[in-house]
Structures are given as structure tokens and as C-alpha cells.
Amino acid sequence: MENKKTIYFLCTGNSCRSQMAEAWGKQYLGDKWNVYSAGMEAHGVNPNAIKAMNEVNIDITNQTSDIIDANILNSADLVVTLCSHADSVCPSTPPHVNRVHWGFDDPAGKEWSEFQRVRDEIGERIKRFSKTGE
């Protein structure tokens, strides 16, 4: 099915939140959406993000940490910024690209429970979007 829409999850380092969002997006939206993630910088996938997603039986070890790709950004049907930094510093998007902000705390460098909490919050938010389109 090539008529898929494209959703692009952005955060600062494409290390934690956007990686989890990409994985949840593929799980909940993969049949209707092409799901990508990127960051203002590429910090590498955080090992705790991998561990947190493994806890819910989602393997993100093969996901890569990428800098924002202008081609994907310019052709995306929906761009979702996941942290205040990416929302304020995100490259300008063309008028036809729908851009929304879903703020989540950055778990990097915090206690393990923060990774679990943020993982679950992102999962619930994307699950809601998959059902309601909001």
C-alpha cells in the first residue's frame, strides 16, 4: 500500500523520546503511516530507551539516530515535536505540513523509572492518535 501518509517525530538528539515514538508509531500506525524520527542532532540511541522498549516487547536496537532530513520534513503529512527545544528550534516547515507539539519530559540522565514513565506516556499518546486522529 503506497498511499501511506508520513509522520515524522522530532526531538533534540533523536536518542530517547523520538526513538520511542518511532517504535510506538510503527506498532500503532504502521499499516497506514510511514513512521520516521530524527533530531536537531544525532546523539545515538540511548541504551535505556532500548531497554525500556524491550520491557514492552518492542525491539529498537536496529533504529538509527538521525539528523533531520529535509526531504522527509518537507514531504511529511504530520511533523510531531516531542520536546520544547525541538519545538522552538525546529526548522521551518512548509505550509502544507501539519506540525503539532506533544511535549514529553526528557528521561536522559534520569532514574530508570523516568524512562518507563515517558515510554508509557508516549505509547498512550500515539495509541490515542491512532484511534482518534488527534
Swiss-Prot record:
Q: Which GO terms describe its molecular function?
A: arsenate reductase (thioredoxin) activity; protein tyrosine phosphatase activity
A Pfam family for this UniProt protein?
LMWPc
Cystine connections: C11-C83, C83-C90
Superkingdom of origin = Bacteria
Q: What does this protein's UniProt record list under function?
A: Catalyzes the reduction of arsenate [As(V)] to arsenite [As(III)].
> Member of which family?
Belongs to the low molecular weight phosphotyrosine protein phosphatase family. Thioredoxin-coupled ArsC subfamily.
Q: Mind telling me which PANTHER family this protein's record contains?
A: ARSENATE REDUCTASE
Record's protein name: Arsenate reductase
Q: Which gene encodes it?
A: arsC
